[in-house]
């Protein structure tokens, strides 16, 4: 065989070998490497994770770790690990997976109606990386609260219920600073001016709003309920709000899981500044986290002459309002008879 034929043959062999090798590499990089059956899943890589830890997190979700490892090394992923929340989709190949691990997907963080700052910290810890203790320590730090005009009692009013976008690996300190910023944004010039017109601070508005929030779930009724409490405050009357008594009992016993369906005379005797049957004015802080509709209901309360209200037996969730104690007692008696007939 002539030399040039040998060279040609060797060239063909080399090309075929290179092609075969290239194809095998291609298959490893671009073949489907997902093992789960769901359409998509999220995985979470903690702050400071090593490459080995990333593999452990991925192990249940990919078909061939060696294929992923080879691709990750070629794309320098082990030297550039990012913490966060990442989206994996069915049908992804190893190249797709590495690319996905470089795209931190935000969390739509939500919260509402927590009664205590501890409950709030627990709710947030379910949605971002820091644990509830680190979040609680961050948001109850005295220096932080004082710098933003809050106390331990009013701290919960800093957090305005809504949906916010956060990266999962947001730190506790970053979270609290963002929330302080959102609070300032919420209390814009218009809302602040309305609070000043009521001779109230934003914290006092939130305080009263928490009572309104607990009194009625009917958003359209909240301005009317707020009007009752504004009338009582302006007349120097006790608020006598049942939700404050329930909160006072829970705080006094340390049990916020207990369910109190009806306020009894024994509950009215609890010695707590949150008991508005015994102590005048607003309680020291919110009895829950009021939502935006309750805050705006106080700022835009309905002007009327009502001083009392009780649950309505005819309109589920709504209340009957009265201008005099005599009329209120009639309304309350009707409701109590109805409750007794229901066997409650």
Regions found by a protein language model. Name each.
Residues 1-250, 288-293, 297-305, 313-344:
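Conserved catalytic or metal-liganding residues and their short signature motifs at active sites
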């Amino acid at each position: 065989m002539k030399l040039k034929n040998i060279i040609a043959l060797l060239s063909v062999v080399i090309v075929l070998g290179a092609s075969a090798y290239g194809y095998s590499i291609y298959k490893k990089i671009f073949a489907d490497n997902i093992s789960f059956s769901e359409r998509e899943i999220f995985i979470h890589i903690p702050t400071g994770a090593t490459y080995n830890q990333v593999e452990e997190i991925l192990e249940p979700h990919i078909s061939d770790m060696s294929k992923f490892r080879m691709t990750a090394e070629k794309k320098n992923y082990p030297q550039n690990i990012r913490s966060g929340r990442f989206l994996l989709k069915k049908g992804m190949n190893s190249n797709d997976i590495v690319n996905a691990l470089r795209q931190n997907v935000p969390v739509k963080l939500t919260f509402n109606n927590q009664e205590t700052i501890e409950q709030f910290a627990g709710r947030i810890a379910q949605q971002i990386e820091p644990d509830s203790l680190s979040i609680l320590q961050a948001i109850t730090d005295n220096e932080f609260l004082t710098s933003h005009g809050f106390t331990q009692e009013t701290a919960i009013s800093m957090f305005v219920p809504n949906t916010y976008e956060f990266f999962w690996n947001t730190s506790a300190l970053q979270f609290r600073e963002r929330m302080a910023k959102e609070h300032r944004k919420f209390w814009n010039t218009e809302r602040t001016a309305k609070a000043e017109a009521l001779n109230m601070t934003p914290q006092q508005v939130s305080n009263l709003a928490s009572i309104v929030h607990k009194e009625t779930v009917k958003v359209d009724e909240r301005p009317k309920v707020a009007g009752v409490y504004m009338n009582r405050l302006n007349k120097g009357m006790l608020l006598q709000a049942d939700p404050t008594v329930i909160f006072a009992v829970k705080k006094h016993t340390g049990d916020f899981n207990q369910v109190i369906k009806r306020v009894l005379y024994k509950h009215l005797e609890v010695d707590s500044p949150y008991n508005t049957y015994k102590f005048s004015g607003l309680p020291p802080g919110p009895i829950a986290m009021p939502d935006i509709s309750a805050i705006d209901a106080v700022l835009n309360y309905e002007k009327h002459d009502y001083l009392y209200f009780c649950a309505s037996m005819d309109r589920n969730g709504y209340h009957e309002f009265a201008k005099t104690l005599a009329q209120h007692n009639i309304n309350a008696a009707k409701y109590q008879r109805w409750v007794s007939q229901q066997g409650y």
